[in-house]
Amino acid sequence: MAAQINPSILSADFARLADEAKAVEGADWLHVDVMDNHFVPNLTLGVPVVESLARATDTPLDCHLMIEAPDRWAPQYVEAGAGSVTFHAEAAAAPVRLAREIRAKGARASMALKPATPVEPYEDLLPELDMLLIMTVEPGFGGQAFLDIMLPKIRRTRELIKKHGLELWLQVDGGVSAATIERCADAGADVFVAGSAVYGASDPAEAVRALRTQADAATAEASWSCDH
């Protein structure tokens, strides 16, 4: 699969979200960070903004729910127009049931793991998912430095995906930039959330294209891709 670049609107101008979405129309998805000031120490946006964004852009929405009680709230984001909904393993009471509900409502189901959460306990759950998100920073704030210590975890996750023959996307989020995206792709990631690296650029659309080119080149040389 070709690398996918998902600009994070956490780094966009919140007063101009519709315009900021249009500025990256060549992106694969628009990454929407939902934070509740409980699961993470920050508060961003909710269902009404997602509904408005879904009307304002043709780019599908990739909603990352950094919230408590995702079992209750995640289905509402599908109804609001999200094409993919990510809940956190650390917050979900019944992740299999929730993933199935998200899928039943018509969206892709994704689960996120914080840096300290190992992937191995969730191996048997992976077939229930369309994507797994490996956080490469502590969730809650944009603009953080990439955690290199997550690269072995990305590799182990890719190995699990191959072991089970899954068509599971592997997303990374946090500190992804021109300086780090190739390492992520080499380790096994194929979906890349980029905030500051896109919206901090003078030409966000060109930044998306450049990141995709870098990721595709690194993937082509990666051992996991050559073995696929």
From Swiss-Prot:
Catalytic activity: D-ribulose 5-phosphate = D-xylulose 5-phosphate
Task performed by this protein: Catalyzes the reversible epimerization of D-ribulose 5-phosphate to D-xylulose 5-phosphate.
Top EC category: isomerase
GO biological process per UniProt: carbohydrate metabolic process; pentose catabolic process; pentose-phosphate shunt, non-oxidative branch
Catalytic residues of the enzyme: 33 (proton acceptor), 173 (proton donor)
Keywords: Carbohydrate metabolism, Isomerase, Metal-binding
Cofactor binding note: Binds 1 divalent metal cation per subunit.
The organism's taxonomic lineage, starting at the top: Bacteria, Bacillati, Actinomycetota, Actinomycetes, Kitasatosporales
Cofactor(s) recorded in Swiss-Prot or TrEMBL: a divalent metal cation
Superkingdom of the source species: Bacteria
Family (UniProt): Belongs to the ribulose-phosphate 3-epimerase family.
A Gene Ontology term for the protein's cellular component: cytosol
GO molecular function terms noted in the UniProt entry: D-ribulose-phosphate 3-epimerase activity; metal ion binding
Binding site for substrate: 8, 64, 140-143, 173-175, 195-196
Gene name of this polypeptide: rpe
Database matches in Gene3D superfamilies: Aldolase class I
Associated pathway: Carbohydrate degradation
PANTHER family: RIBULOSE-5-PHOSPHATE-3-EPIMERASE
EC number per UniProt: 5.1.3.1
Protein name per Swiss-Prot or TrEMBL: Ribulose-phosphate 3-epimerase
Positions of a divalent metal cation binding: 31, 33, 64, 173
Keyword Heme: no
